[in-house]
Amino acid sequence: MDYILVLAKVYPKSGCKDTVIELSDDLIENTLCEEGNIDYQLLKSLNDNTLTFIEKWQSLDALKEHMASSHFQLFGSETEDFVEKMDIQVIGAEELNL
């Protein structure tokens, strides 16, 4: 199965990680209901102050629709004062059946 994999690493400002996590709840809940979404998780690093969204999408078009969604846009505006930066990787992937 081919899909789009997104690794979005979030660098919260000092003392803001819990706020970003709380603000992620609605984003995650709404995204999991989107057509074309396969998986959407938020992971907290054990080693540093980073958070990582791991996303799987059926297509690039589904990802683009997600990025245009109201809940994605709201998350961006709600968290902009709490985040230093984000690094986003978008990968076209094919599962290997080993």
Where are these regions (language model features)?
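N-proximal accessory regions
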Residues: 2-4, 21, 59-64, 96
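Glycine-rich beta-strand-turn "strand-cap" elements at beta-sheet edges
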Residues: 2-4, 42-47, 77-98
